[in-house]
UniProtKB/Swiss-Prot annotation:
It comes from Emiliania huxleyi. SUPFAM superfamilies: F1F0 ATP synthase subunit C. The keyword Thylakoid applies. The gene is atpH. GO terms for cellular component: chloroplast thylakoid membrane; proton-transporting ATP synthase complex; proton-transporting two-sector ATPase complex, proton-transporting domain. Belongs to the ATPase C chain family. In plastids the F-type ATPase is also known as CF(1)CF(0). F(1)F(0) ATP synthase produces ATP from ADP in the presence of a proton or sodium gradient. F-type ATPases consist of two structural domains, F(1) containing the extramembraneous catalytic core and F(0) containing the membrane proton channel, linked together by a central stalk and a peripheral stalk. During catalysis, ATP synthesis in the catalytic domain of F(1) is coupled via a rotary mechanism of the central stalk subunits to proton translocation. Key component of the F(0) channel; it plays a direct role in translocation across the membrane. A homomeric c-ring of between 10-14 subunits forms the central stalk rotor element with the F(1) delta and epsilon subunits. PROSITE patterns: ATPASE_C (PS00605). This is ATP synthase subunit c, chloroplastic.
Length: 82
């Protein structure tokens, strides 16, 4: 394997997982803060808020998992390694 392609793949894998985790991390923090605020205002809506929060957190976390899959593909099943 070309050392330049190998080095670029490692850097790209690091960027893929790093950048893929920034957005969902911020989003999860914001969603959790808003859920706690909603629970403080309306404690009787706890079940509905919790269910919606868990579903939205799962969707946000899936974006990070996609970044991990891209990083693993770049490291172990590199399409650019001729």
């Amino acid at each position: 394997m070309n050392p330049i392609v190998s080095g670029a793949s490692v850097i790209a894998a690091g960027l893929a997982i790093g950048l893929a985790s920034i957005g969902p991390g911020i989003g999860q923090g914001t969603a959790a803060a808003q859920a706690v605020e909603g629970l403080a205002r309306q404690p009787e809506a706890e079940g509905k808020i919790r269910g919606t929060l868990l579903l939205s957190l799962a969707f946000m976390e899936s974006l990070t998992i996609y970044g991990l899959v891209v990083a693993l593909c770049l490291l172990f099943a590199n399409p650019f390694a001729g």
